[in-house]
């Protein structure tokens, strides 16, 4: 029985970081949950001269989720999540706020919130952003328009299409201009939408977003708008998780040399199996091709692979609170392509131990 319970709990823990949250307050319709994890991790990289470099990448992550029952139909909610880098000396100021938002939910009419939250375009990328250590980096990233965690987003979400169609969900999002930062983190006004449908273990999602580029971003001559579209599908049942995603971006994806790619074509895939005794092996593939790029030497109009790797790894869950993991990244990026984008070509190996609650 313990093995069967573990097999059901682990997928939920992977998808939702707060699935194992500790309830710290629940009274008079107000509830507060506290969740987090402490991760001890080290990563080794194989350099071009066959030497190995390694670094500590340990961190801690904590969050609070609150809910207030205003009426029988109206609920207020909020969430805060914070990350602490444990690999640097004291006083290095490596902390960062991942999420901070608040909103209202009215029964089957849906929810509305505002703050720092996940961009709706990430709904498609989330299907394959499930690898052990790496993954989810073909086009999605934080503070890159509405492709990941980002600032100043107003989000409306509706589940089961107003209660009329089980499993049919949609979201609409607006992002205000953020220009008081480095050019690669800026964005103009924009909107995003996503639609997903889930039935009997299968899931399908489509997402699209379009944003104005700031004047500083548009100075590269690629255009005044940035956009992405993506489609993904998954199967999540019978201890199996398998997913694929394809997406394209325009004037949005940032290269390692801090230029924007005029266009990218991206593919990700992952398959995992959850054994009853706690082992969860994983195999993933991530690929991104850039079109009409700025090369490192300043030339424009070059095509090159941006990302190309296979990850093989596994978790072992002792229980719902404790696990260890390891992963190896086989970097397939050609050195000629890497020379254009200034991307790394090293293989990498990661090992870690996690306590989560």
From Swiss-Prot:
<dbReference type="GO" id="GO:0046930">
    <property type="term" value="C:pore complex"/>
</dbReference>
<dbReference type="InterPro" id="IPR001897">
    <property type="entry name" value="Porin_gammaproteobac"/>
</dbReference>
<dbReference type="InterPro" id="IPR050298">
    <property type="entry name" value="Gram-neg_bact_OMP"/>
</dbReference>
<keyword id="KW-0406">Ion transport</keyword>
<keyword id="KW-0812">Transmembrane</keyword>
<dbReference type="Pfam" id="PF00267">
    <property type="entry name" value="Porin_1"/>
</dbReference>
<dbReference type="InterPro" id="IPR001702">
    <property type="entry name" value="Porin_Gram-ve"/>
</dbReference>
<dbReference type="GO" id="GO:0009279">
    <property type="term" value="C:cell outer membrane"/>
</dbReference>
<keyword id="KW-0472">Membrane</keyword>
<keyword id="KW-0626">Porin</keyword>
<keyword id="KW-1134">Transmembrane beta strand</keyword>
<keyword id="KW-0732">Signal</keyword>
<dbReference type="InterPro" id="IPR033900">
    <property type="entry name" value="Gram_neg_porin_domain"/>
</dbReference>
<dbReference type="InterPro" id="IPR023614">
    <property type="entry name" value="Porin_dom_sf"/>
</dbReference>
<dbReference type="GO" id="GO:0034220">
    <property type="term" value="P:monoatomic ion transmembrane transport"/>
</dbReference>
<keyword id="KW-0998">Cell outer membrane</keyword>
<feature type="signal peptide">
    <location>
        <begin position="1"/>
        <end position="21"/>
    </location>
</feature>
<comment type="function">
    <text>Forms pores that allow passive diffusion of small molecules across the outer membrane. Plays a role in resistance to carbapenems; this carbapenem-resistant, noncarbapenemase-producing clinical isolate has a deletion in ompF and a mutated marR gene that does not induce expression of this protein. However if this gene is overexpressed, or if wild-type marR is introduced, this leads to decreased resistance to the carbapenem antibiotics ertapenem, imipenem and meropenem.</text>
</comment>
<comment type="similarity">
    <text>Belongs to the Gram-negative porin family.</text>
</comment>
<dbReference type="GO" id="GO:0015288">
    <property type="term" value="F:porin activity"/>
</dbReference>
<keyword id="KW-0813">Transport</keyword>
<protein>
    <recommendedName>
        <fullName>Outer membrane protein YedS</fullName>
    </recommendedName>
</protein>
């Amino acid at each position: 029985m313990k093995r069967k319970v573990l097999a059901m709990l682990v997928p939920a823990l992977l998808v939702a970081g707060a699935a194992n949250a500790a309830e710290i307050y629940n009274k008079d319709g107000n509830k507060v949950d506290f969740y987090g994890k402490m991760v001890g991790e080290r990563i080794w990289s194989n350099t071009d001269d066959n030497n190995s470099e390694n670094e500590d990448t340990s961190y801690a992550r904590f969050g609070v989720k609150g809910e207030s029952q205003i009426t029988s139909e109206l609920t207020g909610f909020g969430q805060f999540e914070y990350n602490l880098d444990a690999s640097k000396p004291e006083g290095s100021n490596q902390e960062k706020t991942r999420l901070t938002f608040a909103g209202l939910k009215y029964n089957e009419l849906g929810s509305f919130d505002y703050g720092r939250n996940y961009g709706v375009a990430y709904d498609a990328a989330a299907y394959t952003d499930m690898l052990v250590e790496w993954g989810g980096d073909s086009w999605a990233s934080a503070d890159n328009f509405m492709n990941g965690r980002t600032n100043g987003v107003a989000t409306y979400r509706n589940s089961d299409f107003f209660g009329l169609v089980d499993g049919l969900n949609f979201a609409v999002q607006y992002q205000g201009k953020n220009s008081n930062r480095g050019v690669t983190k800026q964005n103009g006004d924009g909107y995003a939408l996503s639609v997903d449908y889930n039935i009997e273990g299968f899931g399908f999602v489509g997402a699209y977003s379009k944003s104005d580029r700031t004047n500083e971003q548009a100075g590269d001559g690629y255009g005044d708008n940035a956009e992405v579209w993506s489609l993904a599908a998954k199967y999540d049942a019978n201890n199996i998780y398998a997913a694929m995603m394809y997406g394209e971006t325009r004037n949005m994806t940032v290269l390692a040399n801090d230029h924007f790619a005029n266009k990218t074509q991206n593919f990700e895939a992952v398959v995992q199996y959850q054994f009853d005794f706690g082992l969860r092996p994983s195999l993933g593939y991530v690929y991104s091709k850039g079109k009409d790029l700025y090369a490192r030497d300043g030339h424009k109009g070059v095509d090159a692979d941006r990302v190309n790797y296979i990850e093989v790894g596994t978790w072992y869950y002792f229980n719902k609170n404790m696990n260890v993991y390891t992963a190896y990244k086989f970097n397939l990026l050609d050195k000629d392509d890497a020379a254009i984008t200034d991307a790394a070509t090293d293989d990498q190996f990661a090992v870690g131990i996690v306590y989560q609650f």
